[in-house]
């Protein structure tokens, strides 16, 4: 997942540098990354957001230097200021998470989509420092029975209708990698945040390694 997501991550972070304000390449939602989630994807007309909804009852901890997180800074000057002043040894100090940072985690691929705090998040990603906790989680698994990516387009399975033709190939590749992960029982190596403070911390991905589970077992 990470090698495929890396070019997309670089594009979304840097596109503001050569675009007008609000003209950056957006990847801050399911619809921007894959296809409009309001489109019907089942024979009976169910829409993508109805069968793959965002849930806020689970939290995962993403490492900005390791886990693929897509930030979309939209203003060149704000991006330049964040990169110049946020980080270890810089004026604002090391990057740290705050309430402005909002990230939706896509499972099973373990990719975070930033929809709040994009400029400072871009600095954390560029510096490879800090952690961010997901705001909500969206599981793509229910979509795999109804949607596929054929290398060019996202298509509905039941009638072959085109849902979108993404500008970049990486979103489609990530979508299909997720299908393979589901078929083979491989989970993303992101750290689950236990809602019970007294509970033992999860070890699903630490600072020094990237844990992969196959059929529930550490590979």
What are the language-model segments listed below?
Residues 1-111:
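Short alpha-helix boundary/capping and kink motifs at helix termini
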Residues 132-160:
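Charge-dense polyanion-binding interfaces
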Residues 111-118:
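Extended catalytic/binding region for NAD+/ADP-ribose chemistry, centered on the ART fold
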Residues 118-131:
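Short active-site loop/helix that positions an aromatic residue
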Residues 162-219:
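Long, compositionally biased intrinsically disordered regions
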């Amino acid at each position: 997942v990470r090698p495929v997501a890396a070019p997309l991550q670089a594009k979304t972070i840097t596109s503001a540098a050569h675009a007008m304000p609000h003209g950056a390449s957006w990847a801050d939602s399911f619809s921007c990354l894959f296809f409009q989630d309001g489109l019907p994807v089942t024979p009976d007309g169910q829409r993508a957001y109805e069968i793959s909804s965002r849930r806020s009852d689970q939290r995962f901890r993403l490492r900005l230097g390791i886990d693929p997180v897509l930030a979309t800074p939209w203003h060149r000057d704000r991006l330049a200021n964040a990169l110049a002043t946020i980080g270890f040894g810089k004026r604002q100090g090391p990057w740290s998470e705050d309430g402005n940072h909002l990230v939706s985690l896509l499972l099973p691929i373990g990719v975070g989509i930033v929809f709040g705090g994009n400029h400072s998040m871009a600095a954390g990603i560029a510096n490879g420092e800090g952690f961010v906790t997901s705001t909500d989680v969206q599981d793509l698994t229910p979509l795999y029975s109804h949607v596929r990516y054929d290398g060019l387009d996202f298509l509905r399975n039941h009638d072959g209708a085109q849902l979108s033709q993404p500008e970049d190939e990486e979103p489609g590749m990530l979508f299909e990698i997720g299908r393979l992960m589901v078929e083979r029982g491989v989970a993303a190596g992101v750290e689950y945040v236990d809602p019970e403070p007294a509970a033992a911390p999860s070890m699903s991905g630490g600072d020094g390694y990237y844990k992969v589970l196959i059929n529930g077992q550490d590979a």
